[in-house]
Amino acid sequence: MLKKIVYKKLFGVFDYEINLKEDGVTIITGPNGFGKSTILKSIDAFYSFNIIFFSRLDYEKISFFSVEGKEPISIEKKGQKIIINGFEINVNDFQDEILRKFRRPYYYRIDESRWIDRRTDEIISEDDLIQEYISSRYMDGEIGIQNTEFQNYIQNILQWQF
């Protein structure tokens, strides 16, 4: 379960330390545009391992702390790289390779970032593909990182509960 979340330079401006109550509700208040909804979305993105969300958000570092006292999981953004406890992920490196997959005749582009698979009528977004590609590449160990450590990291997140 999450105990605390620390944001450094959310939207390039705000530094927050949010302590979450174990036995109750934590209320987040503030003026419009100060990040309340973004904080909730970042918690969801953390638990669903949504790298795309973190690649598009404006921040320097977000740290998630567990009640179990485990080492916090820190997500940093440096240019086009997302660094999760030392593991570097460059989302832009994957986009070209993913888009090459859509040059097959059964994919039809329906707008700037969505395609339809004519075989199944499934609509596929670019974000979904990038997320799937990142997860499969890192989990399969096809990139030059230590796959076992990354799998342990994923397991650690999955064991955390709301």
Residue ranges and their predicted role:
Residues 80-162:
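Electropositive, glycine-dotted interaction segments
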Residues 22-62, 66-69, 74, 80:
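Phosphate-binding glycine-rich loops of NTP-binding sites
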Residues 9-11, 68, 109-112:
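Short, flexible loop/turn elements at secondary-structure junctions
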